[in-house]
Amino acid sequence: MPLLKPDGSVRVCGDYKVTIDHVLEVSEHPMPTDDDTYHPVTGGEKVTKLDLSSAYQQVLLEEESRQYLTINTHLGLFRYTHLPFGVASSPAIFQKIVDSIMNGLQAVGGISDDIHIIGSNDETHFCNLEGALERMRSMGVS
């Protein structure tokens, strides 16, 4: 089903509750609490919020998983090649990636597709921001 995003673009979302969600082995990865998300980024004078572009769609699906994620449209059947929005495992899979991006970085916190970076001054802030951006580049996330 098409969903209108806040920026006016359209997100295609399958309703997987009636197809694969009930037989899916759901990935287990804890979602962060508010304290986990915001504690690392409290007290900074300078703040950057990165909103990852089409977050889930940056994750390539394994070939053998693609057959289970076919959607039926008025134009025919289409098979996802990247992690779709709406599958029960998608949030945990993507949060695990976000957590690995932030692991070991100072003054960085994030949940889902939002990553926050702080610094006490411009120099510290830009150093923290560059560290986060470099980690994202090395992991192929934008």
State the predicted function of each range.
Residues M1-S142:
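Retroelement reverse transcriptase polymerase core
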